[in-house]
From Swiss-Prot:
Binding site for L-ornithine: N165, D225, S229, M230
Family (UniProt): Belongs to the aspartate/ornithine carbamoyltransferase superfamily. OTCase family.
First-tier enzyme category under EC: transferase
GO molecular function annotations of the record: amino acid binding; ornithine carbamoyltransferase activity
Record-level GO cellular component terms: cytoplasm
NCBIfam families assigned: orni_carb_tr, PRK00779.1
Catalyzed reactions: carbamoyl phosphate + L-ornithine = L-citrulline + phosphate + H(+)
Family annotation (PANTHER family): ORNITHINE CARBAMOYLTRANSFERASE, MITOCHONDRIAL, ORNITHINE TRANSCARBAMYLASE, MITOCHONDRIAL
The organism of origin for this protein: Cereibacter sphaeroides (strain ATCC 17029 / ATH 2.4.9)
Major location category of this protein: cytoplasm
Keyword Ribonucleoprotein tagged: no
GO biological process: arginine biosynthetic process via ornithine; citrulline biosynthetic process; L-arginine biosynthetic process
Keywords: Amino-acid biosynthesis, Arginine biosynthesis, Cytoplasm, Transferase
Name assigned to this protein: Ornithine carbamoyltransferase
Amino acid sequence: MNHFLDIHKTDTAELRQMMDSAHAMKAARKGRPKGQLDEDQPLAGRMVALIFEKPSTRTRVSFDVGVRQMGGQTMVLSGKEMQLGHGETIADTARVLSRYVDLIMIRTFEEATLLEMAEHATVPVINGLTNRTHPCQIMADVMTYEEHRGPIAGRKVVWAGDGNNVCASFLHAAGQFGFDFTFTGPSTLDPEAEFVGYAREKGRRVSIERDPAKAVAGADLVVTDTWVSMHDPQSARERRHNQLRPYQVNEALMAQAKPDALFMHCLPAHRDDEATSAVMDGPHSVIFDEAENRLHAQKAIMRWCLGL
């Protein structure tokens, strides 16, 4: 039984195995209707719980479709239905769910909730997102880069904006997949030292550059994310916009990167805030391939968790 909790907690060779599996499964589905089952149906007879303490579109749809394509069934539970940690303990919830399902995916706020779920579950647990990390997204991003440009090892990845949970998982991936990483954004939104330190300990070049044009110079991949959350009050939104406006990914900034550089955004996006529509719909952008690859990467993760 394998939990998928964070990229840095997973063996490098096993990450490579998952990545190769994701590429192969995507290729095998070419030309198939989206509702048609995979030929081998590896999840036939299996039940997967999808827990959403934090709502999502891409995570819910991609996991649900992925399980169904592999022949399994899903049980989708919202935070309101679960009341995680209120009344029944997370530990007891994990033990009970383990009697009903073969695999648990949880998208939650606190990392502690994920870790407690994994500690007490007797079935594999997948991190669908926490406030600290988002490993499933980065597996899809690495897959997308490989699909378009080949190996990501030795490449320069630049993150522009807020050093958030997706940025943190990119730093984990830098250490595991062997690429260099530059963060450009205001000092108040730097990624946590723990994540930067991990990538550096693994021998990767990690730099922080306040000038976005200097940061993006020679980049192979430029990535950004939303500046605000749906839960942020208006005052916080205005403050964030003022802080981050210099780090918008626009055509002038992308022109500083390599001519064949890619642009990614995990979506949903606030168009013309963190990135302009000209970039999002332009020749560097692979955002919709990136979104599709959540499906294939997560299918590979589920197979690995179950030893299939």
